[in-house]
Amino acid sequence: MQDTYRIALGADDAATAMKDAMAAYLIERGHRVTDLSAADGEDYPDVAERVARGVARGEHERAVLVCGTGIGMAIAANKVPGIRAAQIPDSYSAERARKSNDAQIACFGSRTMGIEAALVCLEHWLVSDFAGGGSAPKVEKIKQVESRNLTSPGVPAA
């Protein structure tokens, strides 16, 4: 585990308070935080895409997205090739998102959990690293699924 990361933060209008608490928490721990939250008129898919593209390009090592449930952000971020974003409902899922799935982006719901619980989950996610082992072939299969479906021309949308 690294001591500090370059972390992008993104939130929609429903999640400003949680995002601000997370930003303060991350900065206090020495992480370099870039806030890429919604500008006027932007919706969560716009934010998720901007943040996920930055992670995919290597501008950020990890990212945190927050909307009402975390679900929409995760869905949108996962449309960017190379990204594994996980909706985080609890600390065990936060840990497993990193250790088993190598998720670079954690997605939280401001309407589904309190700020303190979210910060506990955020810490579990931050201190966990991809374990490899038996999970490595599964993550490789996820990449193969992505390669076959997200980048194949002529594949009709579902």
Describe the predicted segments one by one.
Residues 2-15, 91-158:
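C-terminal binding/interaction regions
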Residues 8-29, 33:
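Glycine-rich phosphate/diphosphate-binding loop of Rossmann-like nucleotide-binding domains
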Residues 10, 36, 66-67, 88, ...:
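Structural motif
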Residues 20-23, 75-79, 119:
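Short amphipathic alpha-helical segments
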Residues 29, 81-83, 101:
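Short, structured coil segments at secondary-structure junctions
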Residues 47, 51-88:
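Helix-adjacent hinge/juxtasegments
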